[in-house]
Amino acid sequence: MNSLIISTKDIKKFIISVLIPIVIGFSSNFISEIISKTDTNFQYLELIKPGFFPPPYIFPIIWTILYILMGISAYLVSKKDLNSLKVRDAMFYYYLQLGLNFIWSILFFGLELRLTSLVVIGIMIVVVTVMIIKFTKVDKRAAYLNLLYLAWLFYAFFLNYVIWSINR
């Protein structure tokens, strides 16, 4: 019965863990719009791209789901012993991929550096793969929660590549 009791501290830590990637992700989009002086949805619509590309309203839905899953996974890992080298190592890769995620939107939309953003997303794939491996050593559930994110990154890499190659 005690395992069902959740402390206020744990609830607060959970909420913060979920909010961090959401705030980082959407603030990156906001900064991109300030830099480009254009709504990212409009910018996406204006790009030359094949007809099989998803409509712009899909991206905020997918990213919100992915950010929530990222946050939950970070919570699961960080609630373990934070003094543990395995936990610190895993969280290093978590925050590294969040940083790369943050700059990708700015590069792609804000600065319109499509090739540079393609390189960044390629690096993200490697970092997220390492993060998942590190998470597995701490909490397998946390690792599994990021498999959809990794799959989406491969798809995003493909989209980024096609947009770069058609619009250069």
Show the residue positions of the predicted features.
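N-terminal signal-anchor transmembrane alpha helix
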Residues: 3-33
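Perimembrane loop-to-helix junctions flanking transmembrane segments
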Residues: 39-53
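Interfacial helix-start motif at the membrane-water boundary
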Residues: 50-68
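Core segments of transmembrane alpha-helices
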Residues: 63-74, 97-100
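Membrane-interfacial loop-to-transmembrane alpha-helix junctions, especially the N-terminal start
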Residues: 85-94
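Membrane-interface helix caps and helix-loop-helix hairpins in membrane proteins
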Residues: 104-116, 137-138, 164-168
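Non-cytosolic membrane-interface motifs at loop->transmembrane helix junctions
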Residues: 110-123, 144-145
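Terminal transmembrane helical module of multi-pass membrane proteins
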Residues: 134-168
